[in-house]
């Protein structure tokens, strides 16, 4: 058992050195690109998955926005595989760390915004002031729109962190309750175990949905600026 409820979210170390970089790079092992796998079922599934992601994410974009296709596909596959691996027992989930999610959200958001200011300056500035705004409200609306713009990467990171962390904590609590109830009330323990199984299935769905939501919002930010 962990020392406390949040011990599983502490960055693991080996000989005093953090191994989070190795953990982050681990999902890439699951996507081999060897020529020996050209006709493999895994390769066929990956090809179908990439085509599906491109269809869902990139069809709304202009040719300039579609230059981000590789980045968008890599992002959703990385977040999805990391979230799924984090559901395995005794594993560490990098996406429960706000710093990790901010390190993804801020560069992607900044890249999209900078692209907009470079290629669509007037259109990008127009977002700060909706058409038909009364003159007396112009200063306040500009401030509000500016704040909302800078909140976007924080909202991306906090949403992903909160959803993944909440699910893991709930599984931890129900799992601990099941172990305690096994000796006190086996029928009740059976019920809580069934609830834990259902919650685990739900968390698999949440892991994929959160990867999709994070990537979709990045794609929409990009679409607004290209």
From Swiss-Prot:
PROSITE patterns noted in UniProt: ATPASE_A (PS00449)
Which GO biological process entries does UniProt record here?
proton motive force-driven ATP synthesis; proton motive force-driven mitochondrial ATP synthesis; proton transmembrane transport; response to hyperoxia
> Per UniProt, which keywords does this protein have?
ATP synthesis, CF(0), Hydrogen ion transport, Ion transport, Membrane, Mitochondrion, Mitochondrion inner membrane, Transmembrane, Transmembrane helix, Transport
**Could you tell me which Pfam families the record lists for this protein?**
ATP-synt_A
The record's annotation in SUPFAM superfamilies points to: F1F0 ATP synthase subunit A
Residues annotated as transmembrane: 6-26, 68-88, 97-117, 138-158, 164-184, 189-209
Q: Does the keyword Membrane apply?
A: yes
Determine the domain of life of the protein's source.
Eukaryota
GO (cellular component) term, any one? mitochondrial inner membrane
Q: Which InterPro entries match?
A: ATP_synth_F0_asu, ATP_synth_F0_asu_AS, ATP_synth_F0_asu_bact/mt, F0_ATP_A_sf
> What coarse category fits the chief subcellular location reported for this protein?
mitochondrion
Membrane topology note: Multi-pass membrane protein
Q: Which GO terms describe its molecular function?
A: proton channel activity; proton-transporting ATP synthase activity, rotational mechanism
Its UniProt entry gives the catalysed reaction(s) as:
H(+)(in) = H(+)(out)
Q: Where in the cell is it found?
A: Mitochondrion inner membrane
- Specify whether Repeat is a keyword of the entry: no
User: What job does this protein perform?
Assistant: Subunit a, of the mitochondrial membrane ATP synthase complex (F(1)F(0) ATP synthase or Complex V) that produces ATP from ADP in the presence of a proton gradient across the membrane which is generated by electron transport complexes of the respiratory chain. ATP synthase complex consist of a soluble F(1) head domain - the catalytic core - and a membrane F(1) domain - the membrane proton channel. These two domains are linked by a central stalk rotating inside the F(1) region and a stationary peripheral stalk.
| Family, as annotated | Belongs to the ATPase A chain family.
What the entry lists under NCBIfam families is as follows: ATP_synt_6_or_A (TIGR01131)
- Subunit composition? Component of the ATP synthase complex composed at least of ATP5F1A/subunit alpha, ATP5F1B/subunit beta, ATP5MC1/subunit c (homooctomer), MT-ATP6/subunit a, MT-ATP8/subunit 8, ATP5ME/subunit e, ATP5MF/subunit f, ATP5MG/subunit g, ATP5MK/subunit k, ATP5MJ/subunit j, ATP5F1C/subunit gamma, ATP5F1D/subunit delta, ATP5F1E/subunit epsilon, ATP5PF/subunit F6, ATP5PB/subunit b, ATP5PD/subunit d, ATP5PO/subunit OSCP.
Name-wise, this protein is: ATP synthase F(0) complex subunit a
């Amino acid at each position: 058992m962990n020392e406390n409820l949040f011990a599983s979210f502490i960055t693991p170390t080996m000989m005093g050195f953090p191994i989070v970089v190795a953990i982050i790079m681990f999902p890439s092992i699951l996507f081999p690109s060897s020529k020996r796998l050209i006709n493999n079922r895994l390769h066929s599934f990956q090809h179908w998955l990439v085509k599906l992601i491109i269809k869902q994410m990139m069809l709304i974009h202009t040719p300039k926005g579609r230059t981000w296709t590789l980045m968008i596909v890599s992002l959703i596959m990385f977040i999805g595989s990391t979230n799924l691996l984090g559901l395995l027992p005794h594993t560490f989930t990098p996406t429960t760390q706000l710093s990790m999610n901010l390190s993804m959200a801020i560069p992607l958001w900044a890249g999209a915004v900078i692209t907009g200011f470079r290629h669509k300056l007037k259109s990008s500035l127009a977002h700060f002031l909706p058409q038909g705004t009364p003159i007396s409200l112009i200063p306040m609306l500009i401030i509000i729109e500016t704040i909302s713009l800078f909140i976007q990467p924080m909202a991306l990171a906090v949403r992903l962190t909160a959803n993944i962390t909440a699910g893991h904590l709930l599984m931890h609590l129900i799992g601990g309750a099941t172990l305690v109830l096994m000796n006190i009330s086996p029928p009740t323990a059976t019920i809580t175990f069934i609830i834990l199984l259902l919650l685990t299935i739900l968390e698999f769905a949440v892991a994929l949905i959160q990867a999709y939501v994070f990537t979709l919002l990045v794609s929409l930010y990009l679409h607004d600026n290209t």
